[in-house]
UniProtKB/Swiss-Prot annotation:
Belongs to the FlgI family. InterPro entries: Flag_FlgI. This is Flagellar P-ring protein. The basal body constitutes a major portion of the flagellar organelle and consists of four rings (L,P,S, and M) mounted on a central rod. Keywords: Bacterial flagellum, Periplasm, Signal. It is found in: Periplasm; Bacterial flagellum basal body. HAMAP family: FlgI (MF_00416). Residues 1-16 form the signal peptide. GO terms for molecular function: structural molecule activity. Disulfide bonds: none annotated. The gene is flgI. GO terms for cellular component: bacterial-type flagellum basal body, distal rod, P ring; outer membrane-bounded periplasmic space.
Length: 349
């Protein structure tokens, strides 16, 4: 975990804004799927709701197993909602991740087995079947996931090859950004291909003789100036920064329930802790050390940095001090709200 976190921080410094980062192609998007399922094999952490027992009875009845009403009373099963995102151009046999959330009073879904569950779109059609062993989320055991837990059974048809143009939709309404993207695309191709239709939509015509796939790839990977707001992407399951770790934090003071963080241009100032359980005087590595008293100071005891403090510096410091990920996220949101970082925060599970 420690090494993955360090690698993720290094990769985040290579992250730059492209057209793909701040726009979607109209018509090419994920579709949300949902289904009702049952989990079995829980070690006494399931629920005892009547509708869960009824669902199990119906399932067994469909398998020609007759169970008298009221004879099932087990905390080893749970009723759940199963959701998934069907990627654009997903094909039959593809595997996709599914997310699990309990409906009743189950305490945990960890290591439970999701029985085969139909996942439907808003049109009522079944697009995938989910099944497998669940891994509970660290911060909330009543939710979980199954990587590659669903198999795509039906495809959503979209004839991309027949298109001679695409329309970009900005994630956020901005006349400045729409105009800039129009200019960048036209400059890149050396001809008038892009036209901003409004402050959020840009129509882009495909050059003659170029495949639509190559065209989309070229357009989406055009790099944009730093005037675009950066994105901070955090993987909640791995508790790591995927992108945006190099974002500099402006001077700010954040007061939380158990600590206060002061950040200045030269580094993280002292952090006042009221938590007596923090371990002190422990060497963590060559460039990271917890001081003789529970404080954080990049210039001295904690993390040495020649540059102004970044999001990665702050997150690393808070992780070393054993703060939970929720506390770190809340702190970053407070820093954003106070204007010390101009960034969109995206949490991924």
């Amino acid at each position: 975990m420690k090494y993955f976190f360090i690698i993720a921080l290094l990769l985040s410094s290579l992250y730059s804004q492209t057209i793909k980062d701040i726009s979607n192609i109209i018509g090419i998007r994920e579709n949300q799927l949902i289904g009702y399922g049952l989990i079995v094999g829980l070690a006494g952490t399931g629920d005892k709701s009547k509708f869960t027992m009824q669902s199990l009875q119906n399932l067994l009845r469909n398998s020609y197993i007759k169970i008298p009403a009221g004879s099932i009373n087990s905390k080893n099963i749970a009723a759940v909602m199963v959701t998934a995102d069907l990627p654009p151009f997903a094909r039959q046999g593809d595997k996709i991740k599914v997310n699990i959330s309990t409906i009743g009073d189950a305490k945990s879904v960890d290591h439970g087995e999701l029985l085969i569950t139909q996942l439907k779109g808003v049109d009522g059609n079944v697009y995938a079947l989910a099944q497998g062993t669940i891994v509970a989320n660290e911060n909330n055991k009543t939710t979980g996931f199954i990587y590659d837990g669903a198999t795509v059974e039906n495809e959503i048809n979209f004839d991309l090859q027949s298109e001679d143009s695409i329309q970009l939709s900005l994630l956020k309404n901005s006349a400045k950004n729409a105009d800039l993207i129009e200019t960048k695309i036209n400059d890149t191709f050396g001809k008038k291909l892009a036209t901003a239709l409004d402050t959020r939509t840009i129509d882009v015509k495909k050059p003659d003789g170029m495949s639509i796939v190559k065209f989309i790839s070229l357009v989406q990977n055009i790099e944009l100036e730093s005037s675009f707001k950066k994105k901070l992407i955090i993987d909640m399951n791995r508790e790591s920064i995927l992108a945006g770790g190099d974002i500099v934090i402006d001077p700010v003071t954040i007061a939380r329930d158990t600590f206060t963080i002061r950040i200045n241009k030269t580094g993280l100032g002292e952090v006042d802790w009221n938590n007596p359980t923090i371990n002190t005087g422990v060497d963590i590595g060559d460039d990271v050390r917890i001081a003789d008293k529970p404080v954080i100071d990049i210039n001295n005891a904690m993390i040495n940095t020649k540059n102004p403090p970044t999001v990665a510096d702050l997150v690393r410091s808070m992780k070393v001090m054993k703060l939970p990920m929720k506390e770190i996220i809340d702190t970053l949101k407070m820093i954003k709200d106070m204007g010390a970082i101009d960034v969109d925060i995206e949490l991924r599970e």
